[in-house]
Amino acid sequence: MKIKIINRSHHPLPTYATSASAGMDLRASIEEPITLLPLERRLIPTGLFIELPVGYEAQIRPRSGLALRHGITLVNSPGTIDADYRGEIGIIMINLSNTPFTIADGERICQLVIARHEQAEWVLTDELADTERGAGGFGHTGKE
């Protein structure tokens, strides 16, 4: 799939790390380092603008290494970039650790995954088909 992209950062375009990778790492495009204090969140620019085909979205997901080693994740995860959005891709990062974390220019801060999606059409009804689970909610399917 070919996707139009504008790169206003001075970093290379995102690439897949392996032939089986689902996501590409995005990099911070900042003039000076940004320090996130514990529980602080900030919008981090990437310098990237994309034009997705209709029927696709770009999902923004945390990087597992940043989450495990530093407690850094994304506030709205996954974030969605719609096919009709043309603004800069910005990443809402949060520091869930108890120590400050500094983001450097060019640092890999998240993953971008391209995914196909459908738009639903609601069918108003008075009842739904029965299932084994029924209306069982949170934790209903067991602990194991």
Curated annotation (Swiss-Prot):
It comes from Porphyromonas gingivalis (strain ATCC BAA-308 / W83). Keywords: Hydrolase, Magnesium, Metal-binding, Nucleotide metabolism. The keyword Cell inner membrane does not apply. Belongs to the dUTPase family. One of its GO terms (biological process) is dUMP biosynthetic process. This enzyme is involved in nucleotide metabolism: it produces dUMP, the immediate precursor of thymidine nucleotides and it decreases the intracellular concentration of dUTP so that uracil cannot be incorporated into DNA. It catalyses: dUTP + H2O = dUMP + diphosphate + H(+). Pfam families: dUTPase (PF00692). Pathway: Pyrimidine metabolism; dUMP biosynthesis; dUMP from dCTP (dUTP route): step 2/2. One of its GO terms (molecular function) is magnesium ion binding. Its cofactor is Mg(2+). InterPro entries: dUTPase, dUTPase-like, dUTPase-like_sf, dUTPase_trimeric. Its EC number is 3.6.1.23. HAMAP family: dUTPase_bact. SUPFAM superfamilies: dUTPase-like. The keyword Cytoplasm does not apply. This is Deoxyuridine 5'-triphosphate nucleotidohydrolase. Substrate binds at residues 63-65, 76, 80-82.
